[in-house]
């Protein structure tokens, strides 16, 4: 999978980011190493019933950490980063599947297109099922229904891989299954129910990540206007590792999470012009506007009734 290309606002920004990257903090990757210690250390220690809410947080945080590992942090060695993200605390998918689909998602000109962008919430006209998608497109539906749809789609792709004998994908799922079995055996040994973990912790943690992805992208003609800037509060920024500044991340996928906010604040007005004002003042704004009212993310406007991409959206 080709590495995503960085897109700078201007040469001055390129030079400024280069200066940032030479700082001790960026070179050491200390914030990401501390995050790894927190997720692995505290997750292991909090395996008791009253700690459910904290376990949901740390499991969702682990999913954010996996994203950071995919983009080359804290080391430049993909195989080592994969070791740090392979433990199936997220349960529902292998790290390799997330890595490959997410890197495909970073093709700017294909962003939001349902056939080509694996993370698109849009559909072709043929696959759009009105009532179910409208429920998923409400804020509450995104929390309750979207994780279930994602899990069903992921398991469906796994079954297809076995049916078509895709050896590499089958091996990836077998490794994931073995690690998951070992994790559940360890939980059971500690007297912590794996079923409780799946239903009361892992599913809610996956739902929590759907807060970030709610209207994270829109189907605009200009690829630069397709990713949101969400000026979220501190708690959400920490949980999502600053991916609320999503437009900045898509321009500069190699920038570590602790640099995204600094870069955005240095160029706030320029980024807001660049993404055509696709800016929201925190996740509470989505909650107020779309708690029970569906957002218009359904059949992709760039696809005609035959399911083919119109030229102006390619």
Model-identified regions with their sequence ranges:
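Short, motif-level signal for alpha-helix interfacial/capping segments enriched in acidic residues
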Residues: 38-50, 84, 194-197, 219-234
């Amino acid at each position: 999978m080709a590495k995503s290309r960085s897109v700078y606002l201007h040469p001055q920004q390129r030079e400024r980011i280069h200066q940032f990257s030479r700082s001790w903090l960026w070179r050491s990757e200390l914030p990401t190493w501390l995050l790894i210690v927190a997720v692995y250390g505290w997750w292991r220690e909090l395996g008791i019933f009253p700690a459910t809410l904290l376990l949901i947080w740390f499991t969702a945080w682990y999913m954010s950490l996996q994203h950071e590992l995919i983009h080359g942090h804290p080391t430049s060695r993909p195989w080592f980063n994969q070791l740090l993200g392979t433990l199936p605390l997220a349960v529902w998918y292998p790290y390799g599947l997330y890595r490959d689909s997410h890197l495909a998602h970073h093709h700017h000109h294909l962003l939001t297109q349902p056939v080509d962008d694996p993370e698109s919430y849009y559909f072709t006209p043929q696959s759009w099922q009105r009532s179910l998608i409208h429920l998923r497109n409400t804020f509450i539906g995104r929390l309750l229904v979207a994780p279930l749809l994602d899990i069903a789609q992921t398991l469906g792709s796994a079954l297809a891989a076995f049916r078509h004998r895709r050896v590499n994908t089958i091996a990836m799922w077998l490794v994931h299954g073995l690690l998951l079995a070992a994790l559940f055996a360890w939980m059971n040994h500690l007297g912590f129910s794996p079923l409780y973990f799946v239903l009361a912790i892992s599913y809610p943690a996956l739902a929590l990540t759907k807060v970030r992805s709610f209207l994270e992208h829109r189907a605009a003609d200009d690829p630069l206007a397709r990713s949101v800037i969400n000026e979220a509060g501190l708690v959400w920024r920490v949980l999502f590792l600053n991916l609320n500044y999503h437009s900045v991340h898509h321009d500069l996928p190699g920038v570590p999470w602790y640099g995204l906010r600094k870069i955005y604040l240095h160029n706030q007005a320029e980024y807001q012009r660049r993404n055509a004002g696709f800016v929201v003042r925190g996740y509470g704004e989505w909650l107020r506007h779309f708690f029970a009212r569906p957002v218009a993310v359904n059949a992709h406007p760039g696809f005609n009734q035959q399911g083919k991409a119109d030229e102006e959206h390619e």
